[in-house]
């Protein structure tokens, strides 16, 4: 397992084959020729993937981050590629885009009350994926001023785009906030949710 506690993880390799865990409590970067994932890739911040060839996420493989910025030569997904944050995800495939798994934003609402309290958003905290956080609210007093908080990270506008054919037999949920563009052809026997669809 490759881990980064309070530090970004950066992985540069010709061929990346992951059946274990790659995890970061900050941002993570993967630069590769080919990426074959049947394990778990987690980032509490932004996960940036620059893969020149084929990216295979298979056998219930999981790629999850607060924000996804992924560029690949082609994509074959039968697992889960999930963004837990509210920013628009960015996924670009220069070649064919095959999806029979799940791609997109988390099914768990990010704001307001959770209508299904049994479902708790999972944000990675360690390589084993365990951890917890507790927030308690109290009224500030003059003797106990509120400390300023760090500003939230901002990210670029997102998109899902392929210059090849997009074949979706699974689920692509862009949260209705971003555009999906398939410049060659689109075959959809699954579910698509986007602000705009361009073929």
Predicted regions: what they are:
Residues 1, 109-112:
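Short, compositionally biased segments
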Residues 1-4, 16-23, 36-42, 55-63, ...:
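Short, T/G/N/S-enriched strand-turn elements that build extracellular solenoid repeat scaffolds
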Residues 4-8, 23-29, 43-48, 64-68, ...:
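Short "repeat-start/strand-capping" segments in structured domains, especially the N-termini
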Residues 21, 29, 102, 119-122, ...:
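Generic short N-terminal amphipathic or hydrophobic helices
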Residues 112-150:
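Long intrinsically disordered, low-complexity regions that are acidic and Ser/Thr-rich
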Residues 154, 158-163:
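A structural motif corresponding to the C-terminal end of an alpha-helix
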């Amino acid at each position: 397992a490759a881990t980064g506690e309070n530090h970004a993880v950066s992985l540069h390799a010709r061929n990346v084959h992951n059946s274990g865990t790659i995890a970061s409590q900050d941002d993570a970067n993967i630069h590769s020729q080919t990426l074959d994932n049947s394990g778990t890739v987690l980032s509490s911040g932004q996960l940036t993937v620059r893969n020149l060839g084929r990216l295979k996420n298979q056998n219930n493989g999981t790629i999850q981050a607060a924000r996804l910025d992924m560029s690949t030569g082609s994509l074959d997904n039968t697992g889960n590629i999930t963004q837990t944050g509210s920013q628009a995800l960015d996924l670009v495939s220069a070649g064919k885009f095959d999806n029979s798994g799940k791609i997109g934003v988390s099914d768990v609402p990010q704001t307001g009350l959770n209508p299904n309290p049994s479902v708790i958003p999972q944000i990675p905290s360690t390589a084993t994926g365990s951890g917890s956080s507790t927030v308690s609210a109290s009224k500030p007093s003059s003797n106990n001023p509120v400390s300023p908080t760090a500003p939230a990270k901002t990210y670029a506008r997102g998109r899902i785009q392929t210059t090849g054919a997009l074949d979706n037999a699974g689920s692509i949920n862009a949260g209705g906030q971003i555009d999906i563009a398939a410049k060659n052809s689109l075959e959809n026997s699954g579910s698509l949710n986007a602000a705009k669809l361009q073929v």
